[in-house]
Amino acid sequence: MGSKSKILIIGGTGYIGKFIVEASVKEGHPTFALVRETTVSDPVKGKLVEKFQNLGVSLLYGDLYDHDSLVKAIKQVDVVISTVGFMQIADQTKIIAAIKEAGNVKRFFPSEFGNDVDHVNAVEPAKSVAFAVKANIRRAVEAEGIPYTYVASNCFNGYFLPTLVQPGATTPPRDKVIIPGDGNPKAIFNKEEDIGTYTIKAVDDPRTLNKILYLRPSNNIYSFNELVALWEKKIGKTLEKIYVPEEQILKDIQEAPIPINIFLGINHSVFVKGDHTNFEIEPSFGVEASELYPEVKYTTVEEYLDQFV
C-alpha cells in the first residue's frame, strides 16, 4: 500500500456524513470537509465543525452551488465522498461536473447509503423520489467515465431499531407490534459507525473500483418476525402482533402526505418486497463488505438492541 488517499467529504455535517468523516480520520486518511461559511456559525453544526477541526480535519470553504469553489476543493484531494441529504441528491450533477473539470479524482462515492437503487421494487412516490433520483446519478457518473464505488448500506440502525420501525413511536414496543406484510422478507441493519468504517476501507481498495459495495454482515440480516422474536427474548415478554396486509400499506402510501408517503414506500420496499436480499450479489457488479474486510468488528443487531432493554 502506498500513501493513503486524500478524501473530501461533501455533506460531512449531515446524518451519515459525520460518521464517514470520523472513520476517514480514524483510518489515517488526510481528511477534508467541504463546509459553507454559514455552517461554522450554525449553533448545532458549528459544534460538529469544531469537533472535526479537533480531529484534524481540514475545512475547505465552498458550496455545492458554487462551481469554482467545488473545483478548487476537489483539486486538493484524490477521492470525493458525497453524503448530501435527500433534497440535494439530484444536484450531485454539480459535483460530477466539478470532478470532470478538476480531472484528478481517483474515485467518487455518490450519496447512496441505503438500498441498492438498481434492485428495487418500490411504488410511487418513493420509486422516483428516493430511488430513481439516485439511479440517475449513477448513470451520470458512468456516462462521464468517473471511477466510482456505490455503497449499499441498507438500513441505518439509528433510523429503524430504536422503535422497531413502529409508526410515530420514540421507543421500542412493549405491548403490541405492527408488522408490515407477513414479516418474512429479510432486511439488513447496520450501525452508522460501521457504515463509515466499511466505506473508508473501500476507498483505496481495487476490489471495490466501479462496483457496488454491499453491507450484508451475516449477523445483521433479519426478517421483521425474527427481529420481533429477538426483541421479545430480550424483554422476556410476548408482544401482540398486528400484521398489516400489503393492500392496506399501498392504500396508506397513496393517502399519506409528503414525506410520510416516501418513508412508507421505503419501508414497503424493504420489509414487504424484501429489496435488500431478494437478489444475489454478482461479482460483475458487486462485492460484500464483511467478506472483504473480515477484520472489522461490526456491531450486531443483537448487541445494538441491548441499549433499549
Curated annotation (Swiss-Prot):
What's any GO biological process attached to this entry?
phenylpropanoid biosynthetic process
Q: What is its EC number?
A: 1.1.1.318
Q: In which pathway does it act?
A: Aromatic compound metabolism; phenylpropanoid biosynthesis
Free-text tissue specificity from the UniProt record = Mostly expressed in petals, and, to a lower extent, in sepals, stamens and pistils.
Q: Where are the transmembrane segments?
A: none
Query: Which residues does this entry assign to the site Confers substrate specificity?
Result: 86, 89
The UniProt record gives the binding positions of NADP(+) as 13-16, 35-45, 86-88, 111-113, 134, 154-156
Output this protein's name.
Eugenol synthase 2
What organism is the protein native to? Answer: Clarkia breweri (Fairy fans)
